[in-house]
Structures are given as structure tokens and as C-alpha cells.
From Swiss-Prot:
Function of the molecule: Promotes LRP6 phosphorylation by casein kinases and thereby plays a role in Wnt signaling. May be a membrane scaffold protein involved in the self-aggregation of LRP6 to further enhance its activity.
Name assigned to this protein: Transmembrane protein 198
Key words, A-Z: Cell membrane, Cytoplasmic vesicle, Developmental protein, Membrane, Transmembrane, Transmembrane helix, Wnt signaling pathway
Annotated source species: Bos taurus (Bovine)
Membrane-spanning intervals of the chain: 36-56, 59-79, 93-113, 116-136, 145-165, 177-197, 218-238
Amino acid sequence: MPGTVATLRFQLLPPEPDDAFWGAPCEQPLERRYEALPALVCIMCCLFGVVYCFFGYRCFKAVLFLTGLLFGSVVIFLLCYRERVLETQLSAGASAGIALGIGLLCGLVAMLVRSVGLFLVGLLLGLLLAAAALLGSAPYYQPGSVWGPLGLLLGGGLLCALLTLRWPRPLTTLATAVTGAALIATAADYFAELLLLARYAVERLRAAPVPPLCWRSWALLALWPLLSLMGVLVQWRVTTERDSHTEVVISRQRRRVQLMRIRQQEERKEKRRKKRPPRALPRGSRAPPRPGPPDPAYRRRPVPIKRFNGDILSPSYIQSFRDRQTGSSLSSFMASPTDADYEYGSRGPLTACSGPPVRV
């Protein structure tokens, strides 16, 4: 019976804090032993945190994609790694591969569907603000069960998500600044305390009793709101001064509405024109005459044929005229002058020709 009670007590109540788990006291220096893969992941988080914190709203599509990727990957990894899938316990590598694939799909959906992306951005903002409230209230408030932190996380996340859908630009700027500052603070926590502050936050969310934080942890925790404030100021004054993704979406919607109205007006005019009956003529009036064929006088005349002075003279007459000029016209006149036809070769007297002259 005492063994059963001890087992139930271990399952229901949070574990006691372990001094070896939390490392050395504040007076002693920490023994830093870094590993390659966690250090690389923290460096990447620091770089993404800088982009998020100071260029979040300008890189709007990239922020939506990364937020969807983060949510999808984390949720699917926890489900696959903690639970049995098809009665099989998956390894960490298989769970990471499945989580990465589904995370990419969630990132694409968040980037393409603007409302989904804004909802996830606001939800992330609410979760981070609730976690910061739990960390800040550690010296004054200790939750009795896990339902208190869980309700605070869900309530803050849904509230910020709805507010982000209502006011996208200011809350997206705030969300990206807070998220980037959290990533930078987490990377600094790894290199300073080997993620001691992150483990403290997890234990606070589980409502487990934890020892008080060291001054190094409080300094890293104070870095978070300071970087968030700097990120908001930089984005408000520099990076988002001329960029407004909301106005772009509204202008596109207005353009589509205007085009739709113009098309509807044209369709209505076309239907009215087709349904309109022909106009009836008044009584006593005649219909206008139809245009007939054009007047023959206005037709184009043919080009007149060109004629020359020698067209009506025969070649024999021209030759006799030339002989007269040379002085032999007398002898040729006494003889029987003949006229050779130019075309048929017939020979006849020139004086015997009676009738109209032949035109050549």
C-alpha cells in the first residue's frame, strides 16, 4: 500500500528540484561543454532572430512561411516522438523527417493564405507573452497545477491571434520583434548557461517547483524585452516606413471590384441593346430610300489611246516624199508608181487607191 501511494504521488505531483540538474550556484563559474549540432542550431536561431527582430514586417512572406514551418515541425515532432505511431515507436531521426515535411507544408499554407499566416503570427506572440509573464512572476507566484499556465497560454495566444487579424501591421511588427528577441536570447542562453533559462521556463510551464534564478539568468531574461523594444523602434522608423502589405492587398481587392463592376455594366448594356425593339416610323412618313448603284457618269473612264502623226501615212508615200527631196522624184513620177502594202506585200498604184486612208 505505501508503494502504491508513492507511485501515485510521483505521477500526479511535479518532481522535486534537482541541484545537479540546475548546475552550479551563482558564485561558481559554469563548466561550458558545447556540442557541434546544438551550437550550429543556436547560431542559426540567432541569425533568424536578427532578421525577425529588425526586418520582420519587410520580409512579410518569409516571416509567414517560417512561422508556419516552426509550428508544424514542433507539433508533429512532439506527436511522433512522444507517442506511438501505428503501434511503432519512431526514432528521433524519423520523427524529425516527418516533422520537417509537414512543417514545410504548413509553411506554404501560411504563406499563401494570408489569414492563416496572420493567425499563427498572433498565436506565437500570445504564447511568448504568456511565457514571459510566467517567468517574470516566478518570485511572487507559484501555480498549483498545470491548468493555470495552460489556460494563460491558450487565452493569451487566441487573444493576440484575433487582434492580429484585426490590426495586422502593428501587431505583426510587435510579434516579429518579440519572436526575434526570444530567439537571440535563447542562443545567448546556450552559450552562457547551456540553456538553463529555457529549462527553467519549461519547468514553470509544468508548474514544478524550481530554485530561484541566478543573476546571469535574470540578465538574459532582461535582454529579451530590451531587444524587443529596439526591434519595434527600428521597424517602425526604418524598415516599415514605406512598406504596407495591407494596402497592397486592399488595392488589389479594389481593382478586382472595379473590374467586376465594369464588366457587369457592359453586360447590362449589351443585354439592353439586344432586347430593345426596332423604332417604329411615325404615320405619314416614308422610309428613307436605300442607296442605289452608283451613277455611270462617275465611273472611271478608260485611258485614251495615244496616236502619232505618221499613223495614217503609208510607207510608200513617205518614201516618195523623201525621193522628191533628193531630186529623183521626177523619174519615179514618170514611171508607174506602186504602193506596196506594208502588211500583205501587195503592189498597186498609189493613185488607184480610193477611199479612206488606212490607219496603221
